[in-house]
């Protein structure tokens, strides 16, 4: 048996002040696709020199959130790998690469650097489980500078949504 006690529903948290410098609002990021996110992220990067996202290099959290938002996985129901012919995974990797090449997404080496990027203002957004709010609100000087929204969805995957999960706990 198990008892769930934590939720990992994915949120998009956006720095209002950084977006305003780019002529945008957090509402511009509501219910959007990844191609729109890339377009807006380029605008933010160009006008503020701030990337939209920071991720920890070598982790697959963002890819997994993308997959789950489209009802896909790297595993089949029988537990075997679902990689070679996984069209949604291919698209997720392409999006990640586009974000990275455009400077909209930057990689850091570890969790401490990831949290430091969020708390120092060197990233304009965070896409992660809602549990990340604790790390966001720990930076008291940024109080009132964040807005919560949902995550982007795939442009061309049937059934793709702006919702996913990253984590959760049980005992």
Protein language model regions, located:
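Beta->alpha turn/N-cap motifs
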Residues: 111, 128-133, 152, 167-168
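Glycine-centered hinge/linker elements that transmit conformational signals in sensory
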Residues: 38-44, 79-108, 151
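Short, hydrophobic alpha-helical packing/hinge segments within bilobed ligand-binding/sensory domains
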Residues: 40-41, 96, 114-119, 123, ...
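Extracytoplasmic/periplasmic substrate-recognition and gating elements
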Residues: 22, 98-102, 139-171
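Paired acidic/hydrophobic, glycine-rich loop segments that form the ligand-binding mouth/hinge
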Residues: 124-129, 147-149
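Extracytoplasmic/periplasmic solute-binding protein
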Residues: 1-6, 10, 20, 35-81, ...
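Aromatic-glycine-rich donor-binding/catalytic loop that engages nucleotide-sugar donors
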Residues: 17-29, 102-104
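Short helix-initiation/N-cap motifs at beta->coil->alpha
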Residues: 32-38, 106-120, 153
